[in-house]
Amino acid sequence: MEDILYNAALTFSNVMKYDYIYTLGRKTVLKISVLSNRSYLFTHVCGLDHLKEPPVITANNEAQKKKVYKKILQKKITFSDIQDSPDLNEFIKGTYNTASDSPYTIKDRIIMIEELECILDRSFTGKMYRWDKNKSSVTAAYTQRYININADFLLVVPSERNPDEKNYLFLYQSNKNNKNEDICLHLFSAFSDCVDLTLGQEAPYTILELTKREIETKDEITLFTHPAYSKSKDLALV
């Protein structure tokens, strides 16, 4: 059986090698960096923190979470170790997947993280929001849902698996006290949903440019430049 937990951890490990640099526009141009270089966040990003058992994946602090992540990469903890957890396939209240006509599960979150690098690489097809949980006003077809997530930004990327589905990446800012630096964000929660989680939020930023930079070598590749932004940069060089 394919070990989707290992695949997710391996993808997360690959993503940690890069810094995704977004140039955003609304009223002014904003530049932010998105990093996933904190390995202890893996258990939260893919939902393992919500599993009450088995004990092998229980982690209550950063050191324990790093240890769990390392053991997954070493295949000392595999998906077979958690597949019988009653929480793994329990429906997440308020979510809805039009493809399966049912709510999402923690297992669905793990499967999504297998695709994390691809999602980030094509995130220019999505939108970036400043997130305010107090403005969350999510209404599904059959229930109301309040998203109580303490994030600073929300990156929303259309799914390639289902035209109704979006990939939601919640990000927190680690350098709020450094006003002279570009905003630095870290991914700490991610999941898919066909319910619109952006209702009530302010208008999104336009993604003007997306660059992927390898942290160790500083090599970078521009994944996308908005035509209008490209033109403005060309005019600035004249």
Locations of the language-model features?
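Conserved binding-pocket/active-site segment within a compact domain
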Residues: 118-224
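An acidic, glycine-rich, mixed-charge low-complexity segment common to nucleic-acid enzymes
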Residues: 1-153, 157-158, 226, 230-238
